[in-house]
């Protein structure tokens, strides 16, 4: 898929910009499944740096507000947080949606905004799973958590008319996952807000 080609490009750029730092395709591909693997019996049981916070509020005028932090481990990776814009190269690089995250080096992000439609973030949901079950899900093609929002928003950004907020809630409530998480999201209209607990 396209994400594989993008990972190859990121590996190449790391080699050009930081030749003393070895970064491989396999290393970055492992990060694509960080969230899923961190929920397994192979990971530390420590809950340190595994929490994030999302806040949804509505102003008196009905405007929705969505803010979030990113307390995910490892702490040092926060130093590579970027504001990223996903663009369609065939339409004069028109931005489709954007995000702020350090997961950019996986070609996905865990916090995204599609203007006029939705803002969304994932938050850690505690659970320990068998690594065998998670690896079976990965081999079966379950979408990595870090691509859930990207793949939806790529499709939605091309729709005319765009998908509704309620349809986004339904889609993300039913997307097959290999590991649990919370989805915190707000829409563009008054009252459009949801927190989805996924197992």
Residue ranges and their predicted role:
Residues 175-199:
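C-terminal catalytic or substrate-handling cores of phosphate/nucleotide-
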């Amino acid at each position: 898929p396209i994400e594989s080609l993008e990972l190859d490009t990121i590996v190449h750029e790391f080699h050009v910009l930081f030749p003393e730092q070895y970064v491989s395709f396999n290393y970055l591909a492992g990060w694509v499944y960080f969230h899923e693997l961190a929920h397994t019996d192979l990971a530390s049981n420590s809950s340190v740096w595994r929490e994030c916070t999302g806040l949804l509020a509505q102003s008196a005028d009905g405007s929705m507000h969505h803010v979030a932090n990113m307390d995910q481990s490892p702490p040092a990776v926060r130093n590579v947080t970027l504001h990223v814009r996903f663009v369609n190269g065939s339409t004069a690089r028109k931005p489709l949606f954007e995000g702020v995250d350090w997961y950019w080096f996986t070609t996905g992000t865990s916090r995204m905004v599609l203007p006029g439609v939705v803002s969304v973030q994932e938050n850690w949901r505690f659970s320990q799973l068998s690594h065998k079950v998670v690896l079976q899900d990965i081999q079966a093609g379950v979408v990595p958590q870090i691509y859930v929002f990207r793949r939806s928003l790529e499709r939605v950004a091309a729709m005319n008319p765009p998908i509704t907020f309620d349809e986004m809630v339904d889609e993300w409530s039913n997307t097959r996952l290999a590991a649990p998480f919370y989805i915190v999201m707000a829409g563009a209209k008054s009252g459009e807000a949801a927190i989805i607990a996924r197992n």
